[in-house]
Amino acid sequence: MRFFETLALALLTTGALAAPFRHPHHLLNKRDVSVVTSKVYAYTTVTLEAAASAISTNGAAKEAATAAGDAETTSSVAASVTPAASSSVAASVTPVASSSVAASVTPVSSSAVVDSATSAAASSSVIPTSSSVVASSSEVASSTTSSAAASATSTGSSSGGFQDGVYDCTDFPSDQSGVVALDYLGYGGYSGIQIGDGAGSSCVEGAYCSYACSPGMLKTQWPSTQPSDGETRGGLLCKGGKLYRTNTAYDNLCENGVGTASVQNTLGQGVAICQTDYPGSENMVIPTYVGGGATSPLSVTDNANYFQWEGKGTSAQYYVNKAGYTAEQGCQWGTSSGDYGNWSPLVFGAGMTDGTTWLSISQNPLTSQLANYNVKIVGADGASVSGTCVFENGAFQNGGSGCTVGITSGSGVFVFY
């Protein structure tokens, strides 16, 4: 795969395993050669059931630093996992070689693929805002930033669903139910633009134009036939100057997730949680901003019913910024000298397989930055939870680089405190 890097986020480290089906990330921040001046990144997130009994890796990874200190890797690592029979989460997992996955907060450069497994990592989208977003699993209330340039526009509803060939490509479909415009990204409200094997800055002829959905919802549009280059495509297609669905099995552009996860922020500052736009550009630009004292749903994918990659269920992930960043600041492409976006300290994962929701927290292996808060996963009232997952005072309670819980009934809550 040309021009991009694959990184295995430290979910394959001791105690850090969460969701075992594949969530590849390619084409991250990829740009056409005429407009790009920096290296391109692609993230492969692999989360595994913590009770996995065997992990093997092969392949090699090499790093090359750019002028900005960003790394590029030209090789990948394959991993096979033998899932445990029990749905419970084991307290530890045999760590793998450091050349494939980081066993500490030291940045790594590698790619990993799960060939067999039984759980999932997480995806979510949200209305970005500098002020508080208060949401429950059934209701989302948002407020927008006072800066018009950095605002995100929440959309109204459209009961009839999306109509192909009606909207101009330059007219973001903000009246569609659940769709959220990310105006501050500069793509005309879209979350990302893909043209051929590159990326663009506007929704033009032949482009896939991706979009964000409200908290607790997932986008429904991606072509059933994905390219052989391993880079995912997603969003609406611009054809003849008009927008068309790429997945006509859905009338609406957004659908509700499984509904088994949420975020509760008990801090005095807001936290920007940034979902990767997958399938699609795979940049971490779809924000969930949870203000101090607020709650928000977190979208959870269903392995059996959501996007399939080469016949395997896929998950999603969130980059979790330090408290104090707005969505507009934190859900942007960062650099190694920063501590936001892809360089934010933590990564959340969530997804469902066979009725069990797997939720995880892990250290972002790209950085040694530590979160300026504590966070744990707890069960909502009446939930059945296996395992413990706590990040407190700069370390994981289990002594590893991450942790996972399995929820067989009810829902889980990521609690900032």
Curated annotation (Swiss-Prot):
Residues 1-18 form the signal peptide. It is found in: Secreted, Cell wall. InterPro entries: Beta-Glucosidase_SUN, SUN. GO terms for biological process: fungal-type cell wall organization; fungal-type cell wall organization or biogenesis; polysaccharide catabolic process; septum digestion after cytokinesis. The keyword Signal applies. Involved in cell wall synthesis. May be required for the activation of 1,3-beta-glucan synthase. Belongs to the SUN family. This is Probable secreted beta-glucosidase PSU1. The lineage of its organism: Eukaryota, Fungi, Dikarya, Ascomycota, Taphrinomycotina. The gene is psu1.
